[in-house]
Design a protein with these regions (language model features):
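Metal/cofactor-centered catalytic core regions of large enzymes
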Residues: 2-597
Length: 597
């Protein structure tokens, strides 16, 4: 039975052909997407489904709050560290712990490192192949590719011989008949607009980024012991520092600090001379995508803010990445965000596979309930092999968070819009320069292409902040300030009998909040509302659709059986649905085939 209704400026109509893409690949975790298209192949209904259950909130109940970071960090191995950071923030807020300046600086270095790493991996390894036609690169003239690359930047790997070697490697790979990770690409699709030389350049940089991303994360290994899942501690950072030539075996020394400086320099060089020019090249040949995939970005966006410049101060003046919320498209009125206010952040479950005492009412995370209830309702297929979801009922393992009752978009585009409209000078200069280079209006950033450009902007911004915070750290160390942790309130005997706190930051993918309540030294309640919970949310009791669903609305597909347009827009958000489980069919086989119906 078809249904039609109006919400958030869109007309939802589930009549017409139904296309199912399951799973969405080149993301973190497991995701399914279903859309309806009309006779003109325009998407008139979109359904986003998270196909796995996390449950760490349940696991944490009754545990030592000082250990929470180590559990929640395992939510994700890609955006590694951000959940641990939000967790230690939350526990410190609850107990009243103040961290040393160096701990705050090192935490910011860890976060900025992740931003650079994650945005590079997303741009090249996860989203890049939506824009770069790998097979078309075989048609390129390496000499012309060299001329193109040298016209864009001074990156040294740009000779004709270099691109000839890369092309030859690709040719041998293709002639071997095993395309591997490139096997399921829609090569030759009419939406691929880059010329062969730009495709060869992009593919070469894809390989370089794949290699270089291993170097960036060594900063995590220096200060956190390893990557993924570096070590943290409630009260600071677990890394002693010794800048003398002897003593303090195992501490971070000048050799390690010099390595960090070297990596920061090389990271900025790669982003400035490879990633930024590549992003602009993609934009130059794909300008129509500045009007596709707008979704909620011109209506409702949210950022908590991040990178406190002053230790233990999360106020507006301290956060180098501004926070705020915009609703109803009023960008002249960026609203303050209060994560303790029960009327602001609320999660709904009436279309998710969870239960509340009253499913029609949202709950603030401090009153949050994680009660899984897998009940797909009236679907085509079986409970373990769903052929078509029923969006009128429950259809996702993701709750529906709302800010003051509004579905919101979070992530680089949301952050950039909020920082821009709050007058952040660096953001205004960077965005204006990008859009001017592409001869596009500012509104063009509110799009699928805009999300790609905003990640490039943020990578460059984060690389600059890496140097800023490293310089601050070195100044402290040279002045004899070596403290990296406070143990004043380490023992539970120093804690209140009951307390609660909230920790927030901005993960590469968007606004991240952890809420914790402690009773008698143990975790009594723990709730996480993560970026993809916001963006991939299902419908709520008012029928509002989430950011993914909204961004797909109105998209015209050139070849419905090759849903490149769907992948471009979904990948522009960099979905992260956590990677700890697999989805199995009735016979135990893993469901890995992409199906379009």
């Amino acid at each position: 039975m078809s249904t039609q209704y109006e919400t958030q400026g869109y007309t939802i109509n589930n009549a017409g052909r139904r296309l199912v893409v399951d799973p969405i690949t080149r993301i973190e975790g497991h995701m399914r997407c279903e859309v309806n298209i009309n006779d003109q192949n325009v998407i008139t209904n979109a359904v986003s489904c998270g196909t796995m259950f996390r449950g760490l909130e349940i696991i944490l109940q009754g545990r030592d709050p000082r250990d929470a970071w180590a559990f929640v960090e395992r939510i994700c191995g890609v955006c590694t560290g951000v959940h641990a950071l939000a967790s230690v923030y939350a526990i410190e807020d609850a107990i009243g712990i103040k961290v040393p300046d160096n701990a705050n600086i090192i935490r910011n270095i860890m976060l900025a490192t992740l931003w650079c790493h994650d945005h590079l991996v997303h741009f090249y390894q996860l989203a890049g192949m939506d824009w770069i036609d790998v097979l078309d690169a075989l048609k390129a003239d390496p000499r012309k590719t060299s001329e193109l690359a040298q016209s864009l930047s001074s990156w040294p790997k740009s000779s004709p011989g270099y691109f000839f070697d890369v092309q030859n490697r690709l040719k041998k790979f293709v002639e071997g008949g095993q395309l591997g990770i490139f096997r399921n690409g829609y090569w030759g699709h009419p939406q691929y607009k880059l010329p062969p030389e730009a495709n060869l350049m992009g593919f070469a940089h894809y390989l370089e980024a794949l290699d270089f991303q291993r170097e960036i994360v060594k900063i995590h290994a220096v200060f956190g012991g390893k990557n993924p899942h570096p070590n943290w501690i409630v009260g600071g950072m677990p890394c002693a520092i010794n800048i003398d030539e002897s003593g303090a075996v195992g501490a971070v020394n000048m050799e390690r600090l010099n390595l960090v400086q070297s990596i920061i320099t090389r990271t900025a060089d790669f982003i400035n001379n490879v990633m930024i020019p590549d992003a602009l090249a993609i934009g130059q040949f794909n300008k129509p995508w500045s009007e596709i995939g707008t979704g909620l970005s011109d209506k409702c966006v949210l950022s908590y803010g991040a990178f406190p410049d002053i230790a233990n101060d999360f106020g507006e003046k301290s956060l180098l990445m501004p926070g705020g919320a915009v609703i109803n498209g009023d960008f002249n009125n960026v609203l303050p965000v209060d994560l303790v206010d029960p009327q602001q952040v609320q999660e709904f479950v009436d279309h998710a596979w969870y239960r509340y005492p009253n499913d029609q009412v949202g709950r603030h995370p401090f009153d949050g309930i994680t009660d899984p209830w897998y009940n797909p309702g009236d679907v085509k297929g079986s409970d373990t092999n769903i052929q078509q979801l029923n969006e009128q009922e429950r259809y996702s393992w993701i709750k529906a968070p709302r800010w003051r009752g509004n579905a919101m978009e979070v992530g680089p585009l949301a952050r950039t819009l909020i920082a821009y409209h709050k007058g952040d000078a660096a953001t205004v200069e960077s965005v204006d320069r990008m859009m001017s280079a592409l001869n596009l209006p500012l509104s063009g950033i509110q799009s699928t292409l805009g999300r790609i450009l905003c990640r490039a902007h943020e990578a460059q911004w984060a690389a600059g902040k890496l140097q800023y915070f490293f310089d601050k750290l070195m100044t402290n160390l040279k002045n004899g300030n070596l403290a990296t942790a406070s143990t004043e309130k380490w023992e539970p005997t120093t804690w209140p009998t009951e307390c609660r706190g909230v920790g927030f930051t901005e993960a590469p993918r968007g606004a991240l909040g952890h809420w914790a309540a402690i009773r008698d030294g143990k975790i009594d309640l723990y709730q996480c509302v993560v970026p993809t919970t916001w963006n991939a949310s299902p419908r709520d009791p008012k029928g509002q659709i989430g950011a993914y669903e909204a961004a797909l609305m109105g998209t015209q597909m050139a070849i419905p059986d090759q849903p490149l347009e769907i992948l471009r827009t979904l990948h522009s958000f960099d979905p992260c649905l956590a990677c700890s489980t697999h989805v199995l069919g009735d016979d135990g086989s893993e469901l890995i085939a992409v199906q379009v119906r």
